[in-house]
Amino acid sequence: MCVLSIDIETFSDVDLTKCGVYAYSDSPAFEILLFAYAFDDEPTAVIDIACGETLPHRVLAALEDASIIKTAFNAQFERTCISRYLGRHLSSEGWQCTAVQSALLALPLSLDAVGEVLDIQRKKLKEGVDLVKFFSMPCKATKANGGRTRNFPEHDPEKWERFKTYCIRDVDAEREIRRKLQKYPIPDSEMELYRMDQEINDRGILVDQELVSSAVLCDNQYREMVTARAYELTGLSNPNSPAQIKSWLADRGVETESLDKKSVKSLMAETDGEVLEVLKLRLLMAKTSVKKYEAIERSVCSDGRVHGLLQFYGANRTGRWAGRLVQVQNLPQNHIVDLELARELVKNCLLYTSDA
């Protein structure tokens, strides 16, 4: 069976770590810069797409041919990015992920770490981190760089050649790892689960973007309101500071080692007046959390969906899925009777009404 090993280097103005590969590749600024590949045991070649080279017909045909196995370390990244580049969805059928194969054996989840554990000869090049930062991410505009916000190959041809070598080496490292693990193939049952996982992530979840943005806005307004009242009562420069609040309380005869929820509630039972109100405000300032909404805002794609919420074998010692981006598996159960009313209140930023 023919195998095509792939590694790509890309550019996007979206943060891959914070937003995931789907939003990363969905950006209008997204590009594939380099495409390194090797069929079976053939030497690895690299296509310099950034400098105008195009993918050979043989590679394009293989990408569409389910009988040819496409492999990569973290194949979801390559498949998603190449789908975006080609302008059509590539099914996970015919793709295998060497990272998943490594995780099945409780090996690390990164190419360089697996290479170290298996002591492969052609390890991932350490300088790659700096090269990726230089070419694959926006740069800060300075007088020295002429005010540009991105580095192109012509800005450092020598680095660009090293970047191409780095891309080739990633294919070589992935192939060597795969050969070392060939006695431990991914079982068919696990491959079926992997393809289901990829389908789930490709499909994503539709989100109510109006509700999300309104929830974040409400949180900002609510925090400002609560903090303003805390400033008014305490006169502190930062009423969110535990040290300042402890000192303020001590001046009023209230001593405490901690300001966690349990301690504050205990103090509330013993105080009144301004001290009681400040303690209530302390709880309110720590109460609301819209981190999931903020993660949705960062990660939502142009189709109104958030993709890539699960990582197959993310917990590689147990084989469990791991949540990514929004951590949907940690959403609390919802028992609000008038949920639709609550949603409308949030959408309209009716803080006082919804708080009541």
Residue ranges and their predicted role:
Residues 1-10, 14, 27, 34-36, ...:
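Conserved "right-hand" nucleotidyltransferase catalytic core of DNA-directed polymerases
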Residues 30-37, 41-182, 337:
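Active-site-proximal helix-loop-helix substrate-binding element of RNase H-like nuclease domains
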